[in-house]
Each structure stands twice: as structure tokens, then as C-alpha cells.
């Protein structure tokens, strides 16, 4: 009898324990990180497409607020040092810059992330891709940010 009960429990338990979890994010962070994204150097058409996808990825997380492109300042570098004060006046927490490198059979992205408050580069990375997969490359890059 105990064996039959055990077998019945083993068979029935997984079906009873199965439940669907539905998670809906309706609101982002109360204080999202403020990020300025300079259009990447290189092919301007690809740069616009990359920036659009990456910005949307970051905004959808709810953790980031992206500075409107119309408010971007020219990137100032003096003696190989980024001028951080301009970005601090705009209330930015981070600055993202990058370069698109296109060769015959690859499309690579080099990008840097700067912490405006600490006045230093906090990440420098390279993402490798193929030319006809620009969307995937943009998603990989935004994942790194």
C-alpha cells in the first residue's frame, strides 16, 4: 500500500507543482543612471542604427536614462584626458564613446565607458561581429554597458 501511495505521489506531484510565473515590469528605477552616448566614430549610418538599438536596450531595462542627442556636447579631450566637468554640469553619471571598425568580413566595435563623478575610464571593450548582423552586435554592446 505504501509503495502504491509513493508511486501515485511521485506521478501526481510534478503536475500539481507546475505553475506559470508571470513577471511584468511596469516601472524602472526611481533614480536611473544618467548616460550620455556619443555617436560612435566610423560609418554614420551604422552609428545611428547602433545608437538607436543600444539606447532602446538600455532604456528598456529601467536602470538608465539616456541624454537626448540634441543636448550632446562635443567630445573634448585635452592632453589625452576627457573633460569631465562639462558632462557633470549636464547631470550625467556616465559617458559612452566608441568606434565602428569595418573590414572586409567583420564589423567590430570598440567602446569606452567613463565615470563622470570619479573622472576615470571604467571600461574599455571590443565586440566582434559580422557586417550583416548589426542588430545582434548592438545588443551585445548594450549588454556590456
Which ranges hold each PLM region?
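Positively charged n-region of N-terminal signal peptides that target proteins for export
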Residues: 1-5
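Residues at beta-strand starts and edge strands
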Residues: 6, 31-34, 94, 105-107
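Gram-negative bacterial Sec-dependent N-terminal signal peptides
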Residues: 10-11
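Amphipathic beta-strand/beta-sheet edge segments enriched in Tyr/Trp
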Residues: 21, 55, 79-142
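Short beta-strand->alpha-helix linker/helix-N-cap micro-motif
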Residues: 26-85
Amino acid at each position: 500500500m505504501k509503495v502504491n501511495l509513493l508511486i501515485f505521489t511521485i506521478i501526481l506531484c510534478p503536475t500539481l507543482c507546475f505553475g506559470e510565473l508571470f513577471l511584468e515590469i511596469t516601472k524602472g528605477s526611481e533614480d536611473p543612471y544618467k548616460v550620455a552616448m556619443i555617436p560612435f566614430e566610423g560609418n554614420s549610418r551604422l552609428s545611428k542604427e547602433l545608437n538607436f538599438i543600444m539606447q532602446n536596450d538600455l532604456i528598456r531595462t529601467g536602470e538608465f536614462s539616456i541624454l537626448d542627442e540634441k543636448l550632446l556636447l562635443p567630445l573634448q579631450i585635452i592632453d589625452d584626458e576627457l573633460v569631465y566637468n562639462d558632462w557633470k554640469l549636464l547631470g550625467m553619471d556616465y559617458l559612452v564613446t566608441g568606434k565602428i571598425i569595418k573590414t572586409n568580413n567583420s564589423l567590430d566595435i570598440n567602446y569606452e565607458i567613463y565615470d563622470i563623478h570619479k573622472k576615470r575610464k571604467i571600461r574599455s571593450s571590443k565586440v566582434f561581429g559580422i557586417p550583416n548582423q548589426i542588430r545582434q552586435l548592438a545588443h551585445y554592446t548594450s549588454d556590456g554597458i
